C-alpha cells in the first residue's frame, strides 16, 4: 500500500522515467537500467566532491594563486538518497504497487491546488466527479459477460471515459476510481459502492 505522505519527488522523476497517461509499459529491463543509472548518478562516492582546500596553480612570480572550485549550486538537479532510489524501483517494478502509486499520483496532480483557491484550481484542471449510475452500462463483447460503463466527453469522444468491472474491483476498497479521457486531458472521478455479495 502506498503511504499517504508523498515522497519529496515522485518515483518516476527519481528514476528519470516518463509518467504518462495511460501508464506506459515499462519492461523489467528498462526499470533495472533506470535504477542502476540513478544509483550511479546519486551515489555518494561517485558525486563530484568539492575539495576543502582550494586547488593551487603557480603564477609567473611563483606566488600561489587559487582557482575557484566548481560551484555546487550551479547544478540545480536534486540529489536522491539510495533509500529513495530503492523505494522508487521497488514500487515501479511491482505491478500492484505501481498501479496504486499511479492512481495516487494522478489524483494528486489533478486535484493539486494553490492556497485558498485549491478547490477552484482543482475544478479547472478538468476533474469531474460523478456517480457510477450516471454512466451508460453495457456488457463487453469479450464473451466473459463482464460489464463496462462509459460516458461521452466534451472533446467529442462518445466513450471518452470508460471503466470496467475489473477496474472497479481493483478500487473497491476506496469506492472511487479516477480515469482520464481517451481523447483529451480531462479527468473524471467515479464514485461507487460494491453491493453485498460482490467481489
UniProtKB/Swiss-Prot annotation:
Disulfide bonds: none annotated. InterPro entries: DnaJ_domain, DPH3/4-like, DPH_MB_dom, DPH_MB_sf, J_dom_sf. Its main location: cytoplasm. Gene3D superfamilies: DnaJ domain (1.10.287.110), DPH Zinc finger (3.10.660.10). Residues 10-105 form the J domain. Zn(2+) binds at residues 153, 155, 181, 184. Keywords: Cytoplasm, Iron, Metal-binding, Nucleus, Zinc. SUPFAM superfamilies: Chaperone J-domain, CSL zinc finger. Residues 126-193 form the DPH-type MB domain. Residues 58-74 have a biased composition (Basic and acidic residues). Pathway: Protein modification; peptidyl-diphthamide biosynthesis. Signal peptide: none annotated. GO terms for molecular function: metal ion binding. Pfam families: Zn_ribbon_CSL (PF05207). SMART domains: DnaJ. It comes from the Eukaryota. GO terms for biological process: protein histidyl modification to diphthamide. The keyword Protein biosynthesis does not apply. GO terms for cellular component: cytoplasm; nucleus. The DPH-type metal-binding (MB) domain can bind either zinc or iron ions. Belongs to the DPH4 family. Required for the first step of diphthamide biosynthesis, the transfer of 3-amino-3-carboxypropyl from S-adenosyl-L-methionine to a histidine residue. Diphthamide is a post-translational modification of histidine which occurs in elongation factor 2. This is Diphthamide biosynthesis protein 4.
